[in-house]
Structures are given as structure tokens and as C-alpha cells.
Amino acid sequence: MDRIPVSKKDTGMRSICVFFQHMWQQLNLNSLEIPLKEVYSFMGYNDSEPDEQTRRTVEYLLRECAQFLRPQFKYVIVDGTLDLEQNQLTLIGEKGPVTFDAGKIICRQLRGAQRYAVFVATVGNGYFQWTDAVKRRDDMFQTYAMDCVGSQIVESVADYMETVLQKEIDPSGFKRTNRFSPGYCGWHVSAQPALFSLFTEKNPCGIELTESCLMLPMKSVSGIIGVGPDVRYLPYTCGICNKKDCYKRR
């Protein structure tokens, strides 16, 4: 964990500055809460119970994946300014300012933030070996279930990351917003390269970006979280977003 150097202009933020700038952790799967209900939801079981075969398959895959996956996350805290008229967010990284057309929904949700956590989370590069092992069995259902298990694991990694972030900012009386990612809530996925540029390394947590801004391993997430004494953490409000295929939509 690297600390933020405090300059004179930062003295009003000293209580948060002394805690961190970068945070990276690799996790053991046993430290993660992976709700089976959420895995089944990814599989389409929103209002119904999965059958016995589905339950056995998911439980087997959760045991098996521990051999392959090395979940990890990283976040960096940066200064930034929010322009609610232009619906833009400018973040100040080590290489200079980066401006995002984050859209009305996200900018409104970030109101009150004094700083911003830029994050990535992933199941790790072992996901490639795990998918190869499962696909060699030539079992389409197991391959589908594996994809859903991976989706929930990376969500659990991001959830865990949020608890770590909150513990770091608690002594300052800071709260956090929801996490927001390029590709959702009106923020175009093409913002990914600019977001990644805010990290010191090209491939944080070993995540690579393709030319189409797809993250590899695919079971990876990135985004921002606002922090400050006046921000709010709200349930995901699907009614104000027009993305019909969002994974958070219920």
C-alpha cells in the first residue's frame, strides 16, 4: 500500500491523504462471499429454484476453480472535478488530467465526492486455464455454468474491494458511492483506455485491453467510486437507466 504525499494545498484532506494512494490485494477464494443465489440469477433463475443437476454442477465448479483462480484487485485514489453542466468528470492522475464524458446518471450519483477511487478487479489469468479444462469436457451446460460462476466471482471480488476501501476511509468520516463502470449508465466503454491510464502500470492486475476495449481475462471489472463525507451509497436504480441488458437489472 503506497501512501499519498501531502502538499500544503492538501492539508484539508490530510486525514485521508495519509492512508493510501494505491491498494493492491490478491485474495483467497475462501475469503470471498460467493452467494449461490447470485450465481443462479446469472443463469436465469431469478424467480425459480434451480434443479438438482444445476446445483451440483455449480457447487462442483466452485470447488474446482480454486485450483486455477487467483482473484485480485487494485485501486488508486485520485483528485478530480465534476462538471454537472457538461456531465463530465476530470480525474488527476500521475500523468496529468483525464476527462471522461461519464454521462448524466453517473455524474449525478457522484455529487459530493471529494476524491475518486479508480479500480480494477479480476478473477486472475488462471481463468484461461480453467476455461480450457472445462471446455475439453465438451459439456455445453458445464461451460455455461462456468461462465456464470466466473461472473459472480469477479462481482464478489469487487464487493470485497469496496469493504477494504470503506475501512480505509472510515477514520476520516468518509463514505463511498456505488461503483460505476464504462459501458453502463451512459458511460461509453471506449473510456476504458483512459481509465487504465490512471494506473502506474499498463496492465493493472494483469488485465489487458483489446482494441475493442474488452478486458482480458473477460471476468474482470473496472470503474470508479466516489468518496467523501457527503456522498451516498444507493441501490442500483434501474428506472433511470435505459441499458436493458445490464447485469444489475432485475
Residue positions per predicted region:
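Intrinsically disordered, low-complexity segments enriched in serine/proline and basic residues
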Residues: M1-F19
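Active-site helix-to-loop segments that bind/position phosphate- or nucleotide-bearing substrates
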Residues: F19-T143, R232
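Extended alpha-helical regions
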Residues: L36-S41, C241, R249-R250
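Conserved active-site and cofactor/substrate-binding residues in soluble primary-metabolism enzymes
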Residues: R56, Y60, Q152, S156, ...
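Structural signal for hydrophobic packing residues in well-ordered secondary-structure cores
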Residues: L62-L69, F73, L165, I169, ...
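Internal, well-folded beta-alpha domain core
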Residues: D138-L198
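Short terminal or interdomain "cap/linker" segment that borders an active site or interface and mediates
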Residues: S172-K248
